[in-house]
Amino acid sequence: MSTPTLPDMVAPSPRVRVKDRCRRMMGDLRLSVIDQCNLRCRYCMPEEHYTWLPRQDLLSVKEISAIVDVFLSVGVSKVRITGGEPLIRPDLPEIVRTLSAKVGEDSGLRDLAITTNGVLLADRVDGLKAAGMKRITVSLDTLQPERFKAISQRNSHDKVIAGIKAVAAAGFTDTKIDTTVMRGANHDELADLIEFARTVNAEVRFIEYMDVGGATHWAWEKVFTKANMLESLEKRYGRIEPLPKHDTAPANRYALPDGTTFGIIASTTEPFCATCDRSRLTADGLWLHCLYAISGINLREPLRAGATHDDLVETVTTGWRRRTDRGAEQRLAQRERGVFLPLSTLKADPHLEMHTRGG
């Protein structure tokens, strides 16, 4: 893949704060670096074969750096690297080194994190730390190997557990474990996952099963709601206290009687659209305002055509100021709510897939 020279991208404009039409500031960028994954989780990408983004369209490290500089100029302070499975990308350490060098008051970047399924993590965690990664989130839906195989359609449970333990051994802090909770699949493991998280210095976040692109088996009866989760955990632990919320993060956090904390992301039954400050960039440079967005703004094409930093700042600023997306709220308001997008539609456009837009 040929990488264009970017001579005009080295002098970022002063930072500005941009509001959309719902008065939501831009603050969080989810940066997908690859659309491929080595699992086939039934709630995300259950099919065995997919149409992948053309490899020549994937942003290079230099292009990623240039586009991130654009977002930092308009108020983004948090960047989370996602996939697909980001650890599959061979030059991920270079991406992390490049972005971690931007963390600091001058750029406005306060947080650099990564979300991974953990399969490759045990072998890569030291490299991530050396490259400057600040925080790691690992997806883990069950502590039972057979259930893991049923959910992910792969036999990699031991590798994920080893990866999570390696994160703790490497000295990372503020580690999160993300669990998608599905009735009949793993809803009876909530307390077990909290107990496991204690042993690896992590906090578990339980996520309601979402009907996003790729969730072609979604149904209301499979959703184990936030209310269901709290009721289940109170039977085990007693009174659970909600913790004050100080930012726009999607999780509501709670404390057990002994002070152990956990989070719940109730995007399906209690959407956080009103305060959502996040957007998504696909691995080939399509900027999406919402997880449910059907279309986006291509930033790769103007960048490769010679657009300057300020040109792209104008594009992003204009796009965000026009933003009205409240996808999860609109889905919740539907009387009859089924699968968001049929498989035929997803196969026609890989950008609609959950695994392409970073979850």
Swiss-Prot record:
Biological processes per GO annotation: Mo-molybdopterin cofactor biosynthetic process
Gene Ontology cellular-component terms listed: plasma membrane
Organism from which the protein derives: Mycobacterium tuberculosis (strain ATCC 25618 / H37Rv)
Protease found in the keyword field: no
Physiological role: Catalyzes the cyclization of GTP to (8S)-3',8-cyclo-7,8-dihydroguanosine 5'-triphosphate.
The protein's assembly and partners: Monomer and homodimer.
Keywords on record: 4Fe-4S, GTP-binding, Iron, Iron-sulfur, Lyase, Metal-binding, Molybdenum cofactor biosynthesis, Nucleotide-binding, S-adenosyl-L-methionine
Upper taxonomic lineage: Bacteria, Bacillati, Actinomycetota, Actinomycetes, Mycobacteriales
Protein name from the UniProt record: GTP 3',8-cyclase 1
GO terms assigned for molecular function: 4 iron, 4 sulfur cluster binding; cyclic pyranopterin monophosphate synthase activity; GTP 3',8'-cyclase activity; GTP binding; metal ion binding; S-adenosyl-L-methionine binding
Family: Belongs to the radical SAM superfamily. MoaA family.
PROSITE patterns noted in UniProt: MOAA_NIFB_PQQE, RADICAL_SAM
